[in-house]
Amino acid sequence: MRALLSRDLRLAIRAGGGFGLGLAFFLIVVTLVPFGVGPQGEILARIASGILWLGALLACLLSLDRIFALDFEDGSLDLLATAPIPMEAVVTIKALAHWITTGLPLVLAAPLFAVLLHLPAPAYLWLEVSLLLGTPALSVLGTFGAALTVGLKRGGLLLPLLALPLYVPTLIFGAELVRRGAEGLAIEVPLAMLAGITAATVALVPFASAAAIRVNLR
């Protein structure tokens, strides 16, 4: 399983959909917002939590189509389906590789980008907590959309339409956690909801993704 994880990390970096692309897209989203809503610090601070979370969500979408596509094209996915490792474990490893190459860099860079949006100082801790809790759910949910579209000629166009509705609860509670942290309000409810969503996603979605892969490989 370690060998599979290291292989997926190398493939993700070599394919060009890893660290740099997601961060660049995140930065573009954050820098374009002031042009659209104006440079007023008060307005930017009010919407910063939503913009940062939306940027992270869209950045995660960029490389979802590569989670299974490369393995499907070279036949590795068929070999993995017949390997002694359960397909659910393969899905989990691929989600982890996607998070390490996409989600983790966003978590580390988010405080720097938050400065551009005048995010209040008390919210920085909760921004990091929310992204650490929520971005793994984005990667795991993305495996389900990628599994449904693997092998389709225009799967990359269909994938965002499938993944975005699944991302909405994570987006809502992640942004709400940051907003409440910025305003000094109680954060227990959005924190618990975000943690619950991620826990349920990690526990259940790999089984659905594995089932979708098995159907597409028949």
Curated annotation (Swiss-Prot):
Biological processes per GO annotation: cytochrome c biosynthetic process; cytochrome complex assembly
Keywords associated with the record: Cell inner membrane, Cell membrane, Cytochrome c-type biogenesis, Membrane, Transmembrane, Transmembrane helix, Transport
GO cellular component: plasma membrane
GO molecular function, one term: heme transmembrane transporter activity
Cellular location(s): Cell inner membrane
Taxonomic superkingdom: Bacteria
Topology term for the membrane: Multi-pass membrane protein
Annotated TM spans: 18-38, 43-63, 99-119, 131-151, 155-175, 185-205
UniProt cross-references to PANTHER family, sorted A to Z: CYTOCHROME C BIOGENESIS B-RELATED (PTHR30070:SF1), HEME EXPORTER PROTEIN B (PTHR30070)
Stated family: Belongs to the CcmB/CycW/HelB family.
Function: Required for the export of heme to the periplasm for the biogenesis of c-type cytochromes.
Name the UniProt record assigns to this protein: Heme exporter protein B
Organism: Rhodobacter capsulatus (strain ATCC BAA-309 / NBRC 16581 / SB1003)
